[in-house]
UniProtKB/Swiss-Prot annotation:
This is Oxysterol-binding protein-related protein 2A. GO terms for molecular function: lipid binding. Residues 299-308, 325-335 have a biased composition (Basic and acidic residues). GO terms for biological process: lipid transport. Residues 640-669 form a coiled coil. Residues 50-177 form the PH domain. InterPro entries: OSBP_sf, Oxysterol-bd, PH-like_dom_sf, PH_domain. Pfam families: Oxysterol_BP, PH_11. It comes from Arabidopsis thaliana. PANTHER family: OXYSTEROL-BINDING PROTEIN-RELATED, OXYSTEROL-BINDING PROTEIN-RELATED PROTEIN 2A.
Length: 721
C-alpha cells in the first residue's frame, strides 16, 4: 500500500513504493521521522556500539604516586575512568548493561547500580575521553603499555598482561570504526530521488478544468517536477549540514566535560597560551601527564588526526626539574632606578686615543640587559615550528618537516630588527639555563672558550634536540662592522632525521653617522640526511631597496627536484608554495596560492630603547624560587647585567669594569689547561657537545665544582686551575 500525503501548495502527492523510512501505511510521515530519530545505535552500526567494555587499567599520575589503578568504562564512543575508592566493589551502570570485562576481575568485586531505586551510589567519573577526536597507540618499549592522545592530555596506561593490552586496543579500534558510518547515516534518512515519484493527477485535472490544452499541462508538470527535484536536493544538503553541526556539538560537549573533569584546560593553541606545569607531588588525574614516549621507535598511529601543540612529553628529568607551578612571566622590564645619561661615541674615542684598546671598557650604555648566552636561547623563541616539524615527520610528511625547519632557521633573525645595543660578553665558564615548560623546551649554554670566544648550547624539545657552538669573526669597514658566525647548528629528531646549517653574515651599518641598522645576507644551506634539503638566500639590503629583508629559497629532494619554494622576510613572515612555480606577484601578495609557515609575534606595548621582544624580556628574569637553585655561574646572577636591568647605571659601570678586568685575567685559566664544565670538544674537530649532568646536578643543587666567576679574581684561583 502506498503512502500519500497532500502537498500544501500544489496538490502534489508524494509516492514511494515502500513508504518513507519503512513506516506502516497508517502512520503519518511526521510520526515516522520522529521514530527514526529514536532508533537504537545498533540499527546504524550493526551492533558494534551497543557493546560496553570495562576493566582495571593502571594510569600514570605523577612521579610522587606513580602508577595508580583506575576503573575504565568504554561505552558509546566515550572512555571514562574513575578512582577505585572501595577495592571490593566496582560499579557498573545498570543490571541491563551487556558489559565485556577485560582482565582478571572476580564476580564478587562487581556490583551493579539499581536503575529503579538508585540505592547504590555510582562511582564519580574523574576523566572522559571522546574517541572520535582522539588517537591511540601501543608502546614499543613495554608490551603492557599504550597511550591515548587527546587535545587536552595524554593518558599513559598499562595492563596486567599482553593479552589485556591487545583486547583494549581492539575495543578502542572497534569503537572508532563506528564514527564514519554513524556520521553518514545521520539521525534520519531521505529517500533517494530515483525512488521518489510525484503524483500530479489532481494538478492536471485542475488545469484541464481551467481549459488549458494538453501541451501546456505537460509543460506545467515538467516545471513542477524540476522545481521539486531542486528543492529536494537543497533540503538534503541542509540535512547534511545539520548532521555535521550536531556531531560537532557532541564533540564540543564531550570536550567541555573532559576539561571540567580535569579541573583546568592545560592545552595552548600554537604554543602561545597559558600553561600549568604539573607538580611533582600533587595528584595528576586532573592534570597533564608527562613521560618519555619519544625514546621509542617510530610510532604506528591508529588515527592520524593529531594536534601539533600537545604539551611537552619530555624525559623524566624534565618533569623532575620543574619545581614551580603556574609560572607567570613578566611583560616588561623593571622601572629604572635612575635617569640614564647619554654617551657620545666621539668623546669616548677621543678620550681613549693612544690607549690599549684591549683595556678600554665600553660603558653599559652600549649594552642591552641580556648576555650572549641568553641571546642564543632567543633564537628558539619560535620553537613551536620544530614541534610541528616533529609531528609532520611522524605522520610521514617529510616535506612539511623540512619547510618548518627552514622557517625555524629564519625566525631566529626576527628579534634583531631594531636592536641597536650589544649583549654582554660572557665570562669564561659563564652559563645560562632556561626551563620553559610552557614551550615544552629546556635550554643550556656555556662559554667554552675565551680566545677565540666560543659559546656552546644544547636544547631539548618534544621529539627533538638542538645543539651547536658559534664563534663570531668580525671585520671593521669604517662605517660598518661585518660579523660572520663560524659554527654548525644541528637539529636531530627522535626518529633519526638530522638537519644541519650555519648562520649567514650579519652587518651593522652607520656605526659612526646616520641611522644604525642591522642586515643579514648570504646563502644558508640546510642539509638533511634523508629525503629533503633546503637552500635559503638572504638578500642584502641596498640603498634604494623598497622591500628589504627578503628571503627566498627552495626545498629539494635527493634527486635535485624542487619540491617547494619559500619566500618572505626574515623580520616579518615566511610563506611557501608547492613545486617550482613562483613569481614576483606572489611575493608582493602573500595571500595568493602561498601558505603561511611562520609569522613574527607583535612587539610588546611597553617598548624601551633596547627594543626587546616579549620573549627576550623574560630571559633575565628571576622567577620565584629560581635563584636558590641556580649555579653561581648563571648569567642571571651577573651583577653588572642585573644593575643595568634595574636602571642602576653607575653601579652597572663599576661592576662591568671590575668583571672585564677579571675577564682579561681569565686567559691565564685557559692557558693553564682550563676545560668547560658541561661541554667537551668532539675528537679533532672544533665543535663542542653537551656531556650531560647539568639538570641532574640542578636537581640535587650540587654546584661544588662550579667556581664563583662573578667574584674577585685571585692568584690562588689561577694557580688552582
Amino acid at each position: 500500500m502506498r503512502v500519500k500525503e497532500l502537498h500544501p501548495l500544489c496538490c502534489i502527492t508524494l509516492e514511494s513504493p515502500h513508504g518513507i523510512n519503512s513506516q506502516s501505511p497508517e502512520e503519518p510521515v511526521t510520526t515516522a521521522l520522529t521514530r527514526s530519530r529514536s532508533l537504537p545505535a545498533k540499527s546504524l552500526t550493526g551492533g558494534s556500539e551497543s557493546e560496553t567494555v570495562a576493566g582495571i587499567l593502571y594510569k600514570w599520575t605523577n612521579f610522587g604516586k606513580g602508577w595508580r589503578s583506575r576503573w575504565f568504562l568504554l561505552r558509546n564512543g566515550i572512555l571514562s575512568y574513575s578512582k577505585i575508592r572501595r577495592p571490593e566493589n566496582l560499579n557498573l551502570l545498570s543490571p541491563d548493561d551487556d558489559v565485556r570485562l577485560i582482565g582478571d576481575i572476580s564476580g564478587e568485586r562487581l556490583s551493579r547500580m539499581d536503575s529503579c531505586s538508585g540505592r547504590r551510589k555510582q562511582q564519580k567519573t574523574v576523566g572522559i575521553v571522546h574517541l572520535k577526536v582522539s588517537s591511540f597507540r601501543e608502546s614499543k618499549s613495554d608490551d603492557r603499555k599504550f597511550y591515548i592522545f587527546t587535545a587536552t592530555k595524554t593518558l599513559h596506561l598499562r595492563t596486567d598482561s599482553i593479552t589485556d593490552r591487545a583486547a583494549w586496543l581492539q575495543a578502542l579500534a572497534s569503537t572508532k570504526c563506528i564514527f564514519p558510518l554513524r556520521s553518514l547515516n545521520g539521525d534520519f534518512s531521505f529517500i533517494p530521488p530515483k525512488d521518489l515519484s510525484i503524483s500530479t493527477e489532481r494538478l492536471k485535472k485542475r488545469l484541464h478544468e481551467e481549459g488549458m490544452n494538453e501541451n501546456l499541462v505537460k509543460e506545467c508538470e515538467q516545471i513542477m517536477l524540476s522545481e521539486f527535484s531542486e528543492m529536494h536536493g537543497q533540503v538534503k544538503l541542509l540535512h547534511e549540514e545539520r548532521t555535521n553541526l550536531l556531531d560537532a556539538l557532541r564533540q564540543l560537549e564531550a570536550a567541555n566535560l573532559e576539561v571540567g573533569a580535569s579541573g583546568k584546560h592545560e592545552f595552548s593553541s600554537l604554543g602561545r597560551g597559558k600553561y600549568s606545569e604539573c607538580s611533582t607531588t600533587a595528584s595528576s588525574d586532573g592534570k597533564q601527564e608527562f613521560e618519555d614516549v619519544s625514546e621509542e621507535d617510530e610510532p604506528s598511529f591508529h588515527d592520524t588526526k593529531e594536534f601539533f601543540n600537545e604539551p611537552n612529553i619530555g624525559s623524566e628529568s624534565n618533569l623532575a626539574i620543574s619545581g614551580h607551578t603556574d609560572i607567570k612571566r613578566r611583560t616588561k622590564l623593571p622601572d629604572p632606578a635612575e635617569k640614564e645619561k647619554g654617551v657620545s661615541l666621539w668623546s669616548m674615542i677621543k678620550d681613549n686615543v693612544g690607549k690599549d684598546l684591549t683595556r678600554v671598557c665600553l660603558p653599559v650604555y652600549f649594552n642591552e640587559p641580556i648576555s650572549s648566552l641568553q641571546k642564543c636561547f632567543e633564537d628558539l623563541e619560535y620553537s613551536y615550528l620544530l614541534d610541528r616539524a616533529y609531528e609532520h615527520g611522524k605522520s610521514g610528511n617529510g616535506l612539511l618537516r623540512a619547510l618548518n625547519v627552514a622557517a625555524f632557521a629564519v625566525s631566529g633573525y626576527a628579534s634583531t630588527e631594531g636592536r641597536h645595543c650589544k649583549p654582554f660578553n660572557p665570562l669564561l665558564g659563564e652559563t645560562y639555563e632556561a626551563d620553559f615548560p610552557e614551550k615544552g623546551i629546556r635550554f643550556f649554554s656555556e662559554k667554552v672558550s675565551h680566545h677565540p670566544t666560543v659559546i656552546a648550547c644544547h636544547c631539548e624539545g618534544k621529539g627533538w634536540k638542538f645543539w651547536g657552538d658559534t664563534n663570531l669573526r668580525s671585520k671593521f669597514w669604517g662605517r660598518s662592522i661585518q660579523v660572520e658566525p663560524v659554527g654548525v647548528l644541528t637539529l636531530e629528531f627522535d626518529d633519526g632525521e638530522v638537519f644541519q646549517w650555519s648562520k649567514v653574515t650579519s652587518t651593522i651599518y652607520n656605526i659612526i653617522l646616520g641611522k644604525l641598522y642591522c642586515d643579514h645576507h648570504g646563502v644558508m644551506q640546510i642539509r638533511g640526511n634523508r629525503q629533503y634539503s633546503c637552500t635559503l638566500k638572504f638578500k642584502e639590503q641596498s640603498i634604494l631597496e623598497r622591500n628589504p629583508h627578503q628571503v627566498n629559497g627552495f626545498v629539494e629532494d635527493v634527486a635535485g627536484q624542487k619540491a617547494a619554494t619559500i619566500f618572505g622576510k626574515w623580520d616579518d613572515s615566511l610563506y611557501y608554495v608547492a613545486g617550482d612555480g613562483i613569481n614576483k606577484s606572489k611575493v608582493s601578495d602573500p595571500a595568493s596560492n602561498a601558505s603561511l609557515l611562520w609569522k613574527r609575534t607583535k612587539p610588546p606595548p611597553n617598548v624601551t630603547r633596547y627594543n626587546l621582544t616579549s620573549f627576550a624580556i623574560t630571559l633575565n628574569e628571576l622567577t620565584p624560587g629560581l635563584q636558590e637553585i641556580l649555579p653561581p655561574t648563571d648569567s642571571r646572577l651577573r651583577p653588572d647585567q642585573r644593575h643595568l636591568e634595574n636602571g642602576e647605571y653607575e653601579k652597572a659601570n663599576l661592576e662591568k669594569q671590575r668583571l672585564e678586568r677579571r675577564q682579561r685575567m681569565s686567559r691565564q685559566l685557559q692557558e693553564s689547561g682550563w676545560r668547560p664544565r658541561w661541554f667537551e670538544r668532539q675528537g679533532e674537530s672544533d665543535t663542542f657537545k653537551y656531556t650531560g649532568g647539568y639538570w641532574e646536578a640542578r636537581g640535587h643543587r650540587n654546584w661544588d665544582d662550579c667556581p664563583d666567576i662573578f667574584g674577585e679574581f685571585t692568584e690562588e684561583l689561577a694557580d688552582a686551575a
